[in-house]
Amino acid sequence: MRRHLAVAAVSVAVAALLTNWTAGADPADDVTHHEFQVNCDVNHRLPDDPIVLPNLPGASHEHSFTGNNTTNAATTLASLQAAGVGATSCLAPDDLSAYWFPTMFNGNTPVIPNFKQVIYYKSGIIRYQDVRPFPPGLRYVVGSPNSTLDEFRNHPGHVEGWECGDSFFNWDFPANCPAGTQLNVRFQAPSCWNGRDLDSADHRSHMAYPVDGVCPSTHPNPVPMLEFKIAFPVSGNMSQVRLASGRGYSWHYDFFNAWDPPTLAALVSHCINGGLQCDPRGFDQYKPQRGAALGTNYRLPGRP
């Protein structure tokens, strides 16, 4: 009898522990991501670069622009903001930022991404709760058109290099891509800001990459880590594929922040600081109970 009572007591205790563990295992507390997406179409091409070659139209290799519809060699923060709500190819009408990268060619034919591209805003540091929004007007260049293959391969921003089909970690374009596939590239930006300069002489040194998941003392301010994930609709023989800047390892991109500050702050707070895997509305489909940062019109609640 005593044995049966002891077994019953143990069973009750185990059941209680399991119940408490299950109740405490709220999926909302299981942090595996801290990011949101920006989805934008390529909207124009120009031989301009308002960060590296400001006010010099035609002086650059050709870039494909996404985001703000008005970006050109004369672009400033004021001109991006003056474009007005909705003057963007991105889903969020209040993201008036400009994003651009070298145009890809197959021979002499431009290879233009023909659907919305993905730009991730992530935490680049371990303490994702500390990430803060970009200041208005912050701008920088990621990568370099003058990189060597080894520099591109060893760059702290590389993810998987160029990829297509089952071929990954290519630091120049692969020789062939399976028919019907796309040529993809993913590249991460530095996410630590020096807290003073919106730009620098080389358009890079005011930013830094984290070291072991922590911002260095020279650049102590954590901001979102951009990760461009661009898909080019080209496959087959890649021998004639090139970038306007040169070989595949010359890949680089530019960012000029012109977000509406309250909108960016809401997305950073809800998705990055909140430990969510958000879509462009700031909604995590795996944790729907957490809600969305933006309305169905991709604007802050209450904005038409």
Language-model features: locations:
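Secretory targeting and sorting signals
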Residues: 1-26
